């Protein structure tokens, strides 16, 4: 895929820039204990990640991808989860190898970088700050920043508008079906990372890279 026309790059957060499963799983299991439920294996919680904290709380309570918890139970769980997770955002969350260097290389190409995540903005921004990633991004759009989140095209189109570029000039880099679907809906290039939470071969992206440095090489060489 030729990337010469790309003028900006958007990145997902969880599973793309950072591995946050340890802290998400700890918060989810602390919430389950608070609600009188037994703990879940972190791999189960990993399978529930990707649609924001509200959905994760439903799934962590029910242990079902498409089920919703009873309203009052969800509210208790949500309040507990957010407080617990906010207090332990980066205890065990790690930046994937090569991410910092890769972001620096892309910025050296004078490409604006934005973050588009389904994690709420009030959690995504401090997490990026604590991990030393915030300064790489000119804009961070969380799952609650706009009326719609991925897989909606809205977050991507919003970034295009802010940056003054056309949708086809934005590349969306992520690890999930939501990232690819949002890119498709917006008319942006869809790039998957091969190391994320999902099997990249199942996502139907335009391109799969195994590091951000690999993406830099492709963009530098057109």
From Swiss-Prot:
Known pathway: Organic acid metabolism; glycolate biosynthesis; glycolate from 2-phosphoglycolate: step 1/1
Catalysed reactions, as listed in the record: 2-phosphoglycolate + H2O = glycolate + phosphate
GO annotations of cellular component type: cytosol
Cystine pairings recorded for this chain: none
Catalytic activity, EC: 3.1.3.18
Record-linked PANTHER family: PHOSPHOGLYCOLATE PHOSPHATASE (PTHR43434:SF1)
Official protein name in the record: Phosphoglycolate phosphatase
Native source organism of the sequence: Chromobacterium violaceum (strain ATCC 12472 / DSM 30191 / JCM 1249 / CCUG 213 / NBRC 12614 / NCIMB 9131 / NCTC 9757 / MK)
């Amino acid at each position: 895929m030729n990337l010469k026309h790309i003028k900006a790059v958007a990145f997902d957060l969880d599973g793309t820039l950072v591995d946050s499963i340890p802290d998400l799983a700890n918060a989810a299991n602390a919430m389950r204990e608070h609600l009188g439920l037994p703990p879940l294996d972190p791999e189960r919680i990993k399978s529930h990640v990707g649609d924001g904290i509200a959905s994760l709380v439903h799934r962590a309570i029910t242990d079902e991808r498409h089920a919703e918890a009873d309203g009052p139970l969800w509210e208790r769980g949500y309040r507990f989860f957010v407080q617990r997770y906010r207090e332990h955002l980066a205890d065990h969350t790690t930046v994937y190898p090569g991410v910092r260097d890769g972001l620096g290389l892309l910025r050296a190409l004078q490409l604006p970088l934005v973050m588009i995540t389904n994690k709420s903005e009030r959690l995504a921004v401090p997490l990026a700050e604590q991990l030393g990633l915030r300064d790489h991004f000119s804009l961070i759009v969380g799952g609650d920043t706009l009326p719609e989140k991925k897989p909606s095209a809205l977050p991507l189109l919003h970034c295009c508008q802010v940056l003054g570029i056309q949708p086809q000039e934005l590349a969306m880099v992520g690890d999930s079906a939501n990232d690819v679907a949002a890119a498709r809906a917006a008319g942006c290039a869809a790039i998957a990372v091969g190391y994320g939470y999902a099997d990249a071969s199942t996502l139907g992206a335009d391109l799969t890279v195994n590091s951000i440095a690999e993406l830099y090489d492709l963009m530098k060489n057109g």
